Amino acid sequence: MQKYELMFIINPSLQEEERNKLIGEIKAELKSASLKIINEDVWGEKDFAYKIKGSKNGYYIVYKLESERCEFFDLVKSFNLKKDIWRHLFLKIED
């Protein structure tokens, strides 16, 4: 199995209910892409080195994932269309 790490920066001004809904959507998309969530690490709000979308901070979430194979194109396209996901980064973890 191949392992991956995925980090999100989410709009910090979202209410908890909205943020949980967005996180639920992200998890559903990961599952539909045959990615198994091994670990979810919520960092919470952290300051940026520079402003992103006029904000000095963002809400960080990091996932450790594994899968036999993954279609990243559709996931990245979907994440790019969500206005409250400000940044995301997929990394392939070498054993």
List the predicted regions and their residue ranges.
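S-adenosyl-L-methionine
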Residues: Y63
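Long, contiguous binding/interaction regions
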Residues: M1-G58, E66-D95
